[in-house]
């Protein structure tokens, strides 16, 4: 795999899991990753990116988000992104241990491009490969 400079955002409140995800992404050639502790931090970053006047692709090519986080959860973050004309093209992957049938339906309703359970980190990289090509 060729190293990609496209920027990936990871919103995850667990330090251990975010380090695991980012470490695995780095090993897979995705070195340009920005980490947020919750959906609110990620949303603030995206809002500032829009205000910069530069292409959004300079700031985010893909977003990986946990579902349950403080301040703003992954479903709310996804809905905000997918209802924003400047951001809706960015793929959002919900990556959580909480993907029940009910939560999968909610993820689809808010516009998540993919939903995957946390133990499937190899599958996460395969999904990112597919969504950003």
Feature roles, as predicted:
Residues 69:
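Receiver (REC) domain active-site loop signature in two-component systems and cognate sites
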Residues 12:
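Conserved acidic carboxylate
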Residues 64-66:
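Active-site T/S-Asp motif of two-component receiver
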Residues 15-41:
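Two-component/phosphorelay signaling modules centered on CheY-like receiver
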């Amino acid at each position: 795999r060729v190293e990609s400079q496209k920027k990936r955002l990871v919103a995850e409140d667990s330090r251990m899991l975010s380090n695991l995800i980012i470490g695995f992404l780095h090993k897979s050639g995705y070195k340009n990753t920005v980490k947020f502790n919750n959906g609110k931090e990620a949303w603030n970053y995206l809002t500032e990116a829009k205000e910069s006047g530069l292409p959004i692709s300079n700031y985010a090519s893909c977003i990986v988000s946990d579902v349950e986080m403080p301040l703003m959860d992954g479903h709310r973050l996804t809905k905000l992104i997918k209802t924003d004309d400047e951001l809706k093209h960015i793929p959002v992957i919900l990556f959580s241990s909480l993907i029940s049938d009910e939560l999968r339906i909610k993820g689809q309703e808010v516009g998540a491009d993919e939903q995957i359970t946390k133990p499937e980190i190899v599958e996460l990289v395969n999904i990112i490969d597919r969504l950003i090509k």
